[in-house]
């Protein structure tokens, strides 16, 4: 079986290699999805980057739980149980993959992925001088490219079919838990415990998204929850900025702005992430949008522009020095 399909998603093409069984599963918010995957480059050799079968353990994600590589939710929710399919994903969807791959590899090696620290080494890496600790991932981060994901869907579990603390709460308890989780996230953030703060924000988002599924989209109650969710996502992105996970910030803020183009904080945060990965024109465009929507932020915007210009000047000077040394 070899059926090519378009998922009506920009930059994604699907080819079914083995058809699954039964109807399309119900992928409600909070469902746990278990699958095997292989990630390959689009070169002639179809170079394998990661393979969960080689690791010996399948992957699981929770639907609606702010997974780093959001496009995987789109891919998985198009599949039936037992289905095997290949998905070609353009660069717009794969920019964060090196960060995800690093975390998965460190977990497989028995390391704590949250203990990683950024190293700096001049112009060794153009993206905020990161090294991910794996040469192939460093190259992939320097030069983002389309990737192919081969996925085999193994299991889909509803929220009440597996043990997860959040889902032991009823709707009223979930709503009561949100401000507590939000407040705890803020407290941890102020203490500099960004990983733990991000987890609290994620838990609150999952609670709200579950509640939101019970409301009619774009009506008053749904919009109230949406506003709360966006606030928490931006708090989560603030943690990501501190952790220097800039591509995930770009993905989440861009998603917010696609649906809510008037959120000033999302433009401001996206501008900062663009600046860190040397997308100077995009950063300037977002900062101009901040000024247009919120003139009172002029001082903060000018500060970010000065910082960006200074970093660009430093980068150009380092490049000149490097060229001089290469020429002797």
Curated annotation (Swiss-Prot):
GO annotations of cellular component type: cytoplasm; cytosol; nuclear speck; nucleus; photoreceptor inner segment
Keywords, comma-separated and alphabetical: Cytoplasm, Nucleus, Repeat, TPR repeat
Disulfide topology: none
Cellular compartments annotated: Cytoplasm; Nucleus
Boundaries of every PPIase FKBP-type domain copy: 53-145
UniProt cross-references to SUPFAM superfamilies, sorted A to Z: FKBP-like, TPR-like
Alphabetical list of Pfam families matching this protein: PPIase_AIP
Residue spans of the TPR repeats: 178-211, 230-263, 264-297
The UniProt record lists the keyword Transferase: no
GO biological process, one term: apoptotic process
Its biological purpose: May be important in protein trafficking and/or protein folding and stabilization.
Protein's name according to its UniProt entry: Aryl-hydrocarbon-interacting protein-like 1
């Amino acid at each position: 079986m070899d059926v090519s399909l378009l998922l009506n998603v920009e930059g994604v093409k699907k080819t079914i290699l083995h058809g699954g069984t039964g109807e399309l599963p119900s992928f409600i918010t909070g469902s746990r999805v278990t699958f095997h995957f292989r990630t390959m480059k689009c070169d002639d050799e179809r170079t394998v980057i990661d393979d969960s079968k080689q690791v010996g353990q399948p992957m699981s994600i929770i639907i609606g739980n702010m997974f780093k590589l959001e496009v995987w939710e789109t891919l998985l929710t198009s599949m039936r149980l037992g289905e095997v399919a290949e998905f070609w994903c353009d660069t717009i969807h794969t920019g964060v993959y090196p960060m995800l791959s690093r975390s998965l590899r460190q977990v497989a090696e028995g390391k704590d992925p949250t203990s990683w620290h950024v190293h700096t080494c001049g112009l060794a890496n153009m993206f905020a001088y990161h090294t991910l600790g794996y040469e192939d991932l460093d190259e992939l981060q320097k030069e983002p490219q389309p990737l192919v994901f081969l996925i085999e869907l193994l299991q889909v579990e509803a929220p009440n079919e597996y043990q997860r603390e959040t889902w032991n709460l009823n709707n009223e308890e979930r709503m009561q838990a949100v401000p507590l989780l939000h407040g705890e996230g803020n407290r941890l953030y102020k203490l500099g415990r960004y990983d733990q703060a991000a987890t609290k924000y994620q838990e609150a988002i999952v609670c709200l998204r579950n509640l939101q599924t019970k409301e009619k989209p774009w009506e008053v109650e749904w919009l109230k929850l949406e506003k709360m969710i966006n606030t928490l996502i931006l708090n989560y992105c603030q943690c990501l900025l501190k952790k220097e996970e800039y591509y995930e910030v770009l993905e989440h803020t861009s998603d917010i702005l696609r649906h809510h183009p008037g959120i000033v904080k999302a433009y401001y945060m996206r501008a900062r992430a663009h600046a860190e990965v040397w997308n100077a024109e995009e950063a300037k465009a977002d900062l101009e949008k901040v000024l247009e929507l919120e003139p009172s932020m002029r001082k903060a915007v000018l500060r970010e522009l000065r910082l960006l210009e200074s970093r660009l000047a430093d980068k150009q000077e380092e490049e000149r020095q490097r060229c001089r040394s290469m020429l002797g």
